[in-house]
């Protein structure tokens, strides 16, 4: 489990035990959920739809053996059911906003009953954009419910009537891999449900999603030119675990994710000019497109690297990057190459 997330969760659970620190606990919980949800947002906004049905760890023992789509669905179907059927006692977001049809899901359950290739087949049927809108709505609704809780509410337990309600809802499969959830939830008070599923459950599955997307990016980059169009080295980029490079569909570089068509302006320009990269362009020194826009603090560092490639070639560029990382401790090249591309080029040449 992510060490920082684990420590954060432990602190929140500890604060929940005392009335004097209850409000602080809820505030920290909401902030923590926002932090974790941002990871889901980045994954949904950064990767192609095909990524969400892939199982790079199929057959493995663990949550990472699922798909990205299944993981998202599972987290929030459980949350929607628990938050509304049990705690709020009202209707699920899934039904009130017609997300069943909007997402195109063949089931209404948590998905625990699905095994192996069933998970991939299920994932392929989902509309990822609508799925994201659903989970965002669930998250916001749950946050409101959590924010309205009092310390006394934490001890509220759930009787047989709630159990029967859950069974009647058909939102939990009768399959042995799923039906146990009803007894599990009904055996907890609200404080226990805050832990599972509103916090720790998120941690486990979002961590699994990170493993899945890291593997997908690694697979996507296999055999692909590690030098980006703008002149960066994907092998040395601090986003290397998140990004599959701008030469694949798994590009999550900032200028790709910000672009309306998810294509970096530098990539688009190079393709229009039939160039391998900006380093082949005779307008490079004066270029203000994409990564080279003056307001970008990494513009001159990128330009310095592109100029180095033009002068010495890609192989030597990758070697100088190795030496640069041996000599300096940094994440972003602008920390070393500075804000003047001529000075940055000089540093590269002297490294």
Question: What residue spans do the PLM features occupy?
Answer:
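Cysteine-centered metal-binding/redox modules
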Residues: 220-351
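Short, contiguous alpha-helical
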Residues: 1-10, 54-113, 140-143, 147-148, ...
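Short glycine/proline-rich turn/loop motifs
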Residues: 18-21, 115-125, 180-190
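Short, solvent-exposed segments of well-ordered alpha helices
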Residues: 27, 31, 58-62, 66-69, ...
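Short, contiguous, well-structured surface segments enriched in hydrophobic/aromatic residues
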Residues: 35-46, 50, 175-176, 241, ...
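A generic hydrophobic-segment detector
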Residues: 141-190, 308-351
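Terminal targeting/low-complexity segments that flank the catalytic cores of oxidoreductases
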Residues: 1-39
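Alpha-helical packing segments of well-folded alpha/beta enzyme cores
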Residues: 25, 29-43, 78, 124-127, ...
């Amino acid at each position: 489990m992510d060490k920082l997330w684990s420590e954060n969760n432990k602190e929140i659970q500890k604060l929940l035990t005392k009335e004097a620190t209850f409000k602080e606990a809820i505030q920290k919980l909401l902030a923590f959920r926002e932090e974790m949800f941002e990871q889901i947002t980045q994954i949904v906004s950064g990767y192609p739809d095909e990524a969400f049905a892939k199982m790079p760890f199929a057959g493995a023992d663990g949550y990472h053996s699922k798909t990205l789509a299944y993981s998202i669905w599972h987290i929030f179907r459980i949350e929607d059911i628990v938050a509304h059927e049990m705690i709020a006692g009202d209707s699920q977001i899934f039904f009130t906003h017609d997300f069943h049809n909007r997402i195109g899901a063949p089931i209404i359950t948590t998905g625990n009953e699905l095994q192996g290739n069933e998970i991939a087949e299920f994932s392929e049927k989902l509309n990822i954009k609508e799925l994201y809108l659903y989970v965002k709505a669930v998250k916001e609704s749950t946050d409101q419910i959590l924010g309205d809780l009092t310390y006394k509410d934490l001890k509220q337990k759930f009787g047989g009537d709630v159990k029967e309600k859950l069974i009647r809802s058909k939102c939990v499969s009768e399959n042995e891999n799923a039906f146990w959830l009803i007894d599990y939830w009904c055996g907890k008070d609200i404080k226990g449900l805050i832990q599972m599923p509103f916090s720790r459950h998120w941690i486990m599955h979002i961590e699994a999603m990170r493993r899945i997307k890291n593997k997908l990016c690694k697979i996507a980059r296999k055999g692909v030119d590690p030098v980006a169009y703008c002149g960066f080295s994907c092998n040395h980029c601090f986003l290397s675990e998140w990004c599959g490079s701008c030469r694949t569909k798994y590009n999550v570089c900032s200028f790709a994710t910000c672009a309306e068509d998810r294509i970096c302006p530098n990539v688009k320009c190079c393709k229009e000019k039939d160039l391998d990269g900006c380093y082949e362009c005779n307008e490079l020194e004066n270029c203000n497109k994409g990564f080279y826009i003056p307001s970008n603090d990494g513009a001159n560092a990128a330009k310095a690297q592109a100029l180095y490639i033009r002068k010495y070639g890609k192989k030597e560029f990758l070697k100088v990057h190795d030496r640069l990382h041996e000599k300096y401790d940094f994440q972003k090249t602008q920390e070393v190459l500075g804000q003047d591309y001529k000075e940055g080029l000089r540093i590269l040449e002297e490294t």
